[in-house]
Amino acid sequence: MHVLVTGSSGLIGTALVKKLSVDGHQVTRLVRRTPRPGEARWNPDDGSIETSALRDLDAVVHLSGAGIADHRWTDEYKRTLLDSRQRSTDLIATTIAGLDKKPDVLVSGSAIGFYGACGDEELDESSPAGSGFLADVCVTWEAATAPAEAAGIRVAHIRTGIVLSEHGGALGKQLPLFKFGLGGKMGSGKQWQSWISLDDEVGAILHVLAGNLSGPVNLTAPTPVRQSEFADALGHALHRPTVLPIPGFGPKLLLGGELVDNVLLTGQRVLPAALLADGYVFAQPTLASALTHLLG
């Protein structure tokens, strides 16, 4: 396959490009800087894209977007979170819809924040959108693929959970504290964490590319856990105690109340119903297996 990838320098994109290349696929990466071989230039802010490099595409994986937890949620950064997703997705969808030879599939990023805060309710792809800023962002983000769908391109919205990797993401940020024995449950610890290993994130994307799934696809492991369980499992994997709870006000001082309330102290109990029904087999279906694989 010839696969176009945006967000290729991020945690997921880097791993995906590596796997696609190892498997013998041709990969073109969209970048904002001066392109190197195997890359093409784009700028969603001004709507420019190097269409000459997009000929004969079989698939597009669109992962671009500002990091949800990279900054305090000021009004300006919240606008950046929304605009970086809406503009880039609209540009990708509109561009590939206008190609003479259209790709067969667009796999477009989304997040389980789509479902909002739902307590202990089990959520799958049939569950409705929730309320709140992240849910609103996800709804707008997914709607921006409409031009590609109208052009007859198969579109899958991958609603990704907490991606586990020792090299970054939520786990990477927590590891230093836990390695020093300073980790513990966050807030009440009762909030659900719907996680997925980086290996399965990439594996699930490849499964969607090769198959026939369309519409929303939850990219989470089939065994979500409460945050306190996650903390205990991580401490066990590292052979460190997890007796020090992290009160909510600590992260709020560093990251701001809205981000912490919406991301760290609120969770979703999400199940990958579409993937399981389509026959995807998880490499690391349990948290223990994922942490053992990652941390030894």
Set out the residue ranges of the language-model regions.
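N-terminal Rossmann NAD(P)H-binding glycine-rich loop of SDR-like oxidoreductase domains
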Residues: 3-23
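NAD(P)H-binding glycine-rich loop region in Rossmannoid oxidoreductase-like domains
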Residues: 35, 39-91
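Conserved Rossmann-fold NAD(P)-dependent oxidoreductase catalytic core, especially the SDR/UDP-sugar
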Residues: 90-132
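Conserved beta-loop-beta element that borders a ligand/cofactor-binding pocket
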Residues: 110, 143-166
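Glycine/proline-rich active-site loop of Rossmann-fold NAD(P)-dependent oxidoreductases
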Residues: 139, 151-153, 164-173, 207-217
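Alpha-helical substrate-binding/gating segment
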Residues: 175-183, 191-224
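Mid/C-terminal beta-alpha module of Rossmann-like enzyme folds, strongest
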Residues: 204, 211-258, 292-295
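C-terminal amphipathic/interface module of NAD(P)-dependent oxidoreductases
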Residues: 262-296
